[in-house]
Structure formats: C-alpha cells, structure tokens
Amino acid sequence: MHCPFCRHPDSRVIDSRETDEGQAIRRRRSCPECGRRFTTVETAVLAVVKRSGVTEPFSREKVISGVRRACQGRQVDDDALNLLAQQVEDSVRAAGSPEIPSHDVGLAILGPLRELDEVAYLRFASVYRSFSSADDFAREIEALRAHRNLSAHS
C-alpha cells in the first residue's frame, strides 16, 4: 500500500482489528521511508446484479432512498432507516456470496420493513412485487395480518 504522505510504494502493518461488526478490517500502518503512520479500512466488495445483468456495488444509501420513498408521510426517522439498511446489508452478506441478485436485496428489505411500518411495507411490496390490482393488495394485507397474529402468539 502506498504511503499517503510520501507515496512510498510499501508500508508495514502494525496492528489489525475487525470493525463494523466484523464487516471490515482496520489496519494501522507505518511507512518505512518517512516513518509516518496511517490507517486503512478494508471491506469486501459486495456486488448487486441487476436484472439487466449489470453489476454495481451494494449501497446502503440506495436501500435507504428506496425505503424512504415508501415511508413518505410516515413517522419513520433516519435512525430507523439506517438500522434497516444495516440489517439488509448484514442479511445479504450472510449469504456468503460476493454477488447477489437485486431481487434478493428486495427480499431482504421486506422483512425488516414489515416490522418497522406496515403501511411503508405495503407501499414497497406493491412496487417490488408489481401489484396490478386491488386483489393483490388484499392478499398482501391478509398475509400481513396472519404474520401479525403469528407474532402476537409466539
């Protein structure tokens, strides 16, 4: 790794620690040329494969913006959205694959969103699952009620 101060092409790792709940490694480094120290953070790249076949890096911000639209006018704060995005990222990373279909990202959003806000869940699910009629909404509402009843009894 190049030193950010003198651009020397090598550095020595002094210390390594896991960070971000094991999703990244923080390394403290020293430059043998100028002697200055610096920190690097390494994360494994998680790629999302779109329907078109194009891949792009996973983005928590993209998850948040999509869910924020579904939550418009609802009492959902930024902390809750950030937590949901973290849960989604943890879920897709737990699959263990460096690439994940965008469909699976949508699935990973549905569960935490259902727990966060049922109206936002219905809005998101209607777009994600391409609802085309009131019957689609009615079926989803029934499934939501059944899930709520199961959760209440367990």
Swiss-Prot record:
Entries under InterPro entries matching the protein: ATP-cone_dom (IPR005144), NrdR-like_N (IPR055173), RNR_NrdR-like (IPR003796)
Co-factor remark: Binds 1 zinc ion.
Cofactor(s) the record lists: Zn(2+)
Domain ATP-cone: 46-136
Zinc finger boundaries on the chain: unnamed: 3-34
Subunit structure: Co-immunoprecipitates with DarG in the presence and absence of darT.
NCBIfam families in UniProt: transcriptional regulator NrdR (TIGR00244)
Family: Belongs to the NrdR family.
PANTHER family hit by this protein: TRANSCRIPTIONAL REPRESSOR NRDR
Function text: Negatively regulates transcription of bacterial ribonucleotide reductase nrd genes and operons by binding to NrdR-boxes.
Protein name: Transcriptional repressor NrdR
Source organism per UniProt: Mycobacterium tuberculosis (strain ATCC 25618 / H37Rv)
Lineage: Bacteria, Bacillati, Actinomycetota, Actinomycetes, Mycobacteriales
